[in-house]
Swiss-Prot record:
This is UPF0223 protein BCAH187_A4080. InterPro entries: BH2638-like_sf, UPF0223. SUPFAM superfamilies: BH2638-like. The lineage of its organism: Bacteria, Bacillati, Bacillota, Bacilli, Bacillales. Belongs to the UPF0223 family.
Length: 89
């Protein structure tokens, strides 16, 4: 995509790579679909880096402003569907 991901420069390089992979998974959920377990695994890792609900909401808002994709909606949908199913927004 042609936009800049919201990143916190206090994160380590490894954490930034993990966060970018999570953003790419959200994009994939909207564009092609992604296996639920893959998305939820990346979300769990995201939550290890961003444990605060307030910070998660801030990042979601920033990501949605640049991409048009909602992290919250994608994760809610993933939580609602059965295992091994595709999350497709």
């Amino acid at each position: 995509m042609e936009y800049q991901y919201p990143l916190d420069y206090d994160w380590s390089n490894e954490e930034m790579v993990t966060i970018v992979k999570f953003y790419e998974a959200i994009e994939k959920a909207y564009e092609k679909g992604i296996v639920r377990e893959e998305l939820m695994g990346l979300y769990r890792r995201f939550k290890e880096i961003v444990p605060s609900k307030a910070e998660e909401k801030k990042i979601d808002k920033e990501f949605q402003e640049v991409s048009g994709y909602s992290i919250y909606r994608a994760i809610q949908k993933a939580k609602e569907i059965e295992e091994e199913k595709l999350v497709k927004m």
